[in-house]
């Protein structure tokens, strides 16, 4: 059938939505993320391209969250 289905589970991605958060809220969120930074849209886009190009990878949910879900 050659149907591939994968999903991306993003964590906090720097965006207009995170830009309006107070420093206190941002600091509290970043304290929980092992990489200590918000992700970037380009990083999610790179993962999307990778998943779309893999012929033998299917049925996966890939977290891109700076290690938060570990």
Task: Show where each model-derived region lies.
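Short, cationic motifs built from Arg/Lys/His that form the positively charged side of catalytic pockets
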Residues: 4-6, 37
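Hydrophobic/aromatic beta-strand patches that form the interior of the parallel beta-sheet core
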Residues: 6-8, 62
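Catalytic Tyr-x(3-8)-Lys segment
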Residues: 24-43
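Short, small/polar-rich loop/turn modules that mediate ligand/substrate recognition or access, typified
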Residues: 2-4, 58-59
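Short, flexible catalytic-loop segment of classical short-chain dehydrogenase/reductase
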Residues: 9-19
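N-terminal/domain-start segments enriched in small and hydrophobic, helix-friendly residues
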Residues: 5, 16, 26
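C-terminal substrate-recognition "lid" of short-chain dehydrogenase/reductases
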Residues: 37-64, 69
């Amino acid at each position: 059938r050659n149907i591939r289905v994968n999903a991306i589970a993003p964590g906090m991605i720097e965006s207009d939505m995170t830009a309006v958060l107070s420093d206190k809220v941002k600091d509290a969120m970043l304290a929980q993320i092992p990489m200590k930074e918000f992700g970037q849209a380009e990083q999610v886009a790179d993962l999307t391209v990778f998943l779309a190009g893999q012929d033998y990878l299917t049925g996966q949910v890939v977290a891109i969250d700076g290690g938060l879900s570990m």
